[in-house]
Amino acid sequence: MPVKGSSNNSGSVEDKARRDLRCACKNARASLTADAVMEESACICRYITASAPYRSADRIFCYYPLEGAGEADVLPAAKQALLEGKQIAFPRVTGDHMEFIRVDELQDSFREGSFHVMEPVGSEVLTPSAQALILVPGVAFDSAGGRMGYGGGYYDRYLSAYPETLCMGVALHIQMVTDVMAQPWDIPMQYLATAQGVVHTAVKNDICNDKR
């Protein structure tokens, strides 16, 4: 793995390594069968809804899985949150801006939006409360809480505006890597949810201290 600052072209070498890792992880994820993704996602959702960050949250910020891309499906967790009386919201993108829209039921509440992702059709914008939990998708994660996104920076920009809100990365087993080669602007995850459980990461900052 290239070392930052080890040579004049270290930046370009590292950029290429990140591009290669993103491509490899996306291809590996896309190779999973729909049944395999569904089975692993169901397990992940059970761990999410049993976790302390979820139980203490009043608002759950979810995401709609990319169809056919092998992305972990958190809709079962969103459905459970609604049954428990929690508020839920899903992202909607306009230009470079992402916001979360409240959803009161999962049927007929979405339409295809930016990047062919299903987006909510409602109009009520929700912002993270002090007790909110944001479920964060990604291409790859590492055990230190590092996250590699899709390259657009939408989540990093959004999460940077709410530094005290708990973030839980959601990953299939094939998305866990040794090192995502995080950049200074990449927002780390305080928790990771996988089919092995929900774990607190090694993130060392104020928002990592779960006082609830």
Language-model features, listed with the residues they occupy:
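Conserved phosphate- and dinucleotide-binding cores of soluble alpha/beta proteins
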Residues: 2-6, 96-212
